[in-house]
Amino acid sequence: MSNPLLHIEGLPPFSQIKPEHIQPAIQELIEENRQVIEQVLKQPHFTWENFIEPLSEAGEHLSRAWSPISHLNSVKNSPELRDAYQACLPLLSEYSTWVGQHRGLYNAYLALKNSPEFATYSVAQKKAIENALRDFELSGIGLSEEKQKRYGEIVARLSELSAQFSNNVLDATMGWEKVIEDESQLAGLPESALLAAKQSAESKGLKGYRFTLEIPSYLPIMTYCENAALREEMYHAYATRASDQGPNAGKWDNTAIIEEIMTLRVELAKLLGFNTYTERSLATKMAENPQQVLDFLNNLADRSKAQGEKELAELKAYCEKEFGVTELAPWDISFYSEKQKQHLYAINDEELRPYFPEDRVISGLFELIKRIFNIRAVERFGVDTWHKDVRFFDLIDETDEVRGSFYLDLYARENKRGGAWMDDCIGRKRNADGSIQKPVAYLTCNFNAPIGDKPALFTHDEVTTLFHEFGHGIHHMLTKVDVPDVAGINGVPWDAVELPSQFMENWCWEKEALDFISGHFETHEPLPEEKLNQLLKAKNYQAAMFVLRQLEFGLFDFTLHHTFEAGKANQVLDTLKAVKDKVAVIKGVEWARTPHSSSHIFAGGYAAGYYSYLWAEVLSADAFSRFEEEGIFNPVTGKSFLDEILTRGGSEEPMVLFKRFRGREPQLDALLRHKGIAN
């Protein structure tokens, strides 16, 4: 039986991939890579062509197989697939440690760096070699054999733990449901949420309305449902997912997993000669040292706190006056905030949905990139995908060259991980014959699917999410760097990687852009002037409270990784409490366990890096302010952003690229102005 994962040419053959193909393919490809490495190292001297290129080619075979496997694990999870995926994690971890500690490889890279030929390399080639040498150091190349062995054990165990953490969050999210037959208990809920809940119940052969902890089901209850007891019940279930508390206490508990992850991260950092895990994290980031990050977060907290307190005081005063409510619990905040927002601005998310049908939003997004970057998006049909709802598009430039392509998977489904993300399917590289391999991305969201004969209708918030992920997508797809390790998002420091994504969100708040991004699904009329003005006025409603919530995550993550000591009790919840006392205006509840479902921090790339969202937002707000000065559709400014930032991938330091685009270092003012925080 031939294995579809071996030596994939072109796009992944999704319909042919079965769980039983996975482990044999990965084992074979790892072995092939090991052989190629040993083979090239036998040469008397090393050049780019005889050393880097064959390694890159073999590495490509492995990543082309692993990318669809990893993607399917996120979008079409099943017990068989999950087992096959997890069986590969230790193999990949062991292989990557073997590479990272391979003295012969390290010496070969060093020889290239010190060769006369190095001076003739392109900026991207030099950067790829320098990054590789740095990564050898971070993989313990300089350690004794015993310490190297321990490093390998830690990395393998961490990869296992983060997969277990994710599985627990997914299982806990899917492991709770609430079925309600009496519609009177759902007063206030918008029609779209009722229809979705009814459809969900029918799909399970149940009567009434079925609610789950998936965001499209959970958020409408928290925002609109008059039934406070139901809001509390759902909040309780959501805030205690995968923990020792709540309705499924102890069932998918991440408590011990977090402890072990933190203990191992600290050990790893110390093994490599760092004082803290934050220092290890920043070794590959734009920020220079932990103090700089803490100062940045604390400075932003100081500037936002008073306004956040004022926003909460205004909400409380409104609740007391209008509803006689004097105490606000956490499950009341979204509900009463929505009421106050409607009172102040006569607008709600649900009213806007009919103006953001899927086809209009997608065509508006494509119109925008045509105007600013002169890039066309064209749908391609007949592509093999993992679900019938998935679409595929090519991005084409003014010379009619296909620059990149992407899969678009917009709707929430069972066995699909929550949230929204962009991931790379294929990276750009120059092939041995001189041809260019074009990049391909996965763009994944979790929006409500079309119901009945209505198209999918998005909230404005969801529109912003789509633009955000598309920003990551164009960073990957429009790169002109041909060296895989620094092409697209590869090699981009984590605290700069959110620059293009947050940058793209800005147009969702511009009248001239909303004129073609919005259009009523029945009449095709764009968003009426009065609704548009209300939307823009409401943009900064509770802006400081929102920034403070981001700071709470950022400071919790960074402080925990900066101060964690193995064996000391209760550090996770104590750190969270200390951070909340400092920055939060909304008091938490004793039983809430947000860290236990914080996949970004414990199962994603944001360990001691969650601050990156706000850090990059300073860059993106300031970058957009150049468009505000020169015209938001100015093609010259657009070309400058494309040429100086998007096409360059990770080939140069982000600060160098930013200064080239902006003409100076980034300033905090634009962010505060965009957020409506008094400067």
Segment roles from a protein language model:
Residues M1-H21, E28, F46, G188, ...:
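C-terminal, non-catalytic "cap/extension" segments appended to globular domains
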Residues M1-N33, S74-N77, L81-E288, R303, ...:
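His/Asp/Glu-rich acidic catalytic environments and adjacent acidic regulatory segments
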Residues F14-I26, T47-I52, G250-N254, V293-L297, ...:
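Membrane-entry segments of alpha-helical transmembrane domains in multi-pass membrane proteins
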Residues I30-T120, Q550-L560, F564-D581, V585-G588, ...:
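C-terminal non-catalytic alpha-helical accessory regions
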Residues N50, Y85-L89, D253, F296-L300, ...:
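Membrane-interfacial loop-to-helix junctions in multi-pass inner-membrane proteins
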Residues E60-H71, R134, H236, I333-K341, ...:
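Short, hydrophobic/amphipathic alpha-helical patches that form generic packing surfaces
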Residues A124, A128-E130, R157-E160, N167, ...:
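Active-site-proximal, well-structured secondary-structure segments within enzyme catalytic domains
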Residues N448-F467:
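Short pre-active-site segment immediately N-terminal to the catalytic Zn-binding motif
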